[in-house]
Amino acid sequence: MKISLVTDAWLPQVNGVVTTLVELGRELRAAGHQVQVIEPGQFRTRSCPGYAGIDLAIAPAKGLADKLDAFQPDAIHLATEGPLGWAGRRYCLRRGLAFTTAFHTKFPEIVNAAIRVPLRLGYAVMRHFHAPSSGVMVPTPSVLEMLRWRGFRNLREWTHGVDTELFAFRETAGDYPGLEEAARPIALFVGRVSYEKNIEAFLRVDLPGTKVVCGVGPVEAQLKERHPHVRWIGLLPRATLAQLYAAADVFVFPSRADTFGLVMAEAMACGTPVAAYPVDGPLTVLARRREEDGSSDARLGGAMHEDLQTACFAALAVPRHEARQRSLDFSWTQAASLFASFLVPAHGRGAPGSSPAVVTQMS
C-alpha cells in the first residue's frame, strides 16, 4: 500500500511524536508498504514562537499538493494539527478524499499553560480539525474517553512501542560520564523543558541523592536559575540517552498533559522504574487493563500517586526486571500493524468500520 504521512513533527526535532512517526515509518516499510513522509524540512519554514528547535512550514499548500499528486497514495494520514496538517486536510476535502488523523498532543493544555487560551476554545479548534477524519487515532483509553466526552467522533485506540534492543536492560543502575560520583539515588527526567511538562513539580520534590534533567526548551534558563543543584544534561543522541536511562535509579514523569509519554517506556526498557501522577499516559504505560481474572490495574514498572514524592519512593522499591518486563508489552511492529488496519482508502469514503478489511485487500 502507498501511504502518505503528513506531519509537522519530524527530524531534527526531538520529541515523542517524532520518535513515534520515525519508528512507524520504519515498521511500515519493513512490512512492504511504500511510505511518503511530507514534513517541514521540505518547505520554507519559520521557528515556532516560544519553541526554538521546532520549525513550521510556511504556506505549504501548493508544495504539499504537488507531492501528493505525484505520489498518488492509497491512504493519507495527517499526523499533526500544524500548518502541514491543515494543508493536508484542505487538500483532501477539496478532492473528496478520505483520510485519517491522530491526536498525539494536548495542544489545548499547552497553549493554556503558555498563554492562558481557554481549554474550551482550544478543544473546539481541535474538534473542528478532526471532524472530517475517517479515524482519529489516540494513544490511550483515557484520552479516547476524554475526547469522546468533548464531542470527537470516529476515535480509534492506537498504542505505541519501544525499541527494546536500543534501550537495553541493566540489572543494576550503571554509570554515566560525569555522574560516577553523583549521590544515589539518581532521579532522572527526560523531555522538552517546557511549560506543559510540569518539570518544576519534580525539581521541588524533596528527594535524597541527585536530580538530573536531560533536554532543552523554553523554560530551561529560568529553571536552571531556580534549581542550581540539578544536573542539566541537554540533548543526547538516542544511543547515549539509553546509557543515561540505565544509570538512573528512578525516572520521574511529572507531566499531566502528555497523551502517552514514550520516555517512560524507554526508561523501563533499560530497567529504570517510573514515578508519575495517575493521569493519562502513566495510567496506560504503568498499569495493565483489567483482565478476566480480576487482576486489573496492577502497577507494572513503576508507581503512581498524587503525591509525587510518595510515587518516587514507591518506584525506587520496584525491581528493575519488573520495569523491563512491562516495557516488552509495547511493540513497534504491533503498533504499525494496528495503524495500517485503521487506514482508509483515500478514494473510497465508506464507513470507517469497514476500512480494515479494505486495507487488508490493498496491502
Q: What positions do the PLM features span?
A:
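Nucleotide-activated donor-binding/catalytic signature segment of Leloir-type glycosyltransferases, i.e.
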Residues: E220-A239
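Donor nucleotide-sugar binding/catalytic pocket of nucleotide-sugar-dependent glycosyltransferases
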Residues: A124-G178, A182
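Short alpha-helical donor nucleotide-sugar binding micro-motif in glycosyltransferases
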Residues: L68, H130, Q243-A248, F339
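Aromatic "clamp/platform" in nucleotide-sugar-dependent glycosyltransferases that forms part
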Residues: R256
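A charged, aromatic-enriched C-terminal amphipathic alpha-helix characteristic of glycosyltransferases
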Residues: G174, L316-G348, P352
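Short hydrophobic beta-strand element within catalytic cores of glycosyltransferases
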Residues: P273-P278, L283, A287
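Nucleotide-sugar donor phosphate/pyrophosphate-binding loop at the beta->alpha transition
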Residues: A98-T100, E109-H128
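Conserved donor-binding/catalytic core segment of Leloir-type glycosyltransferases
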Residues: D175-P208, V212
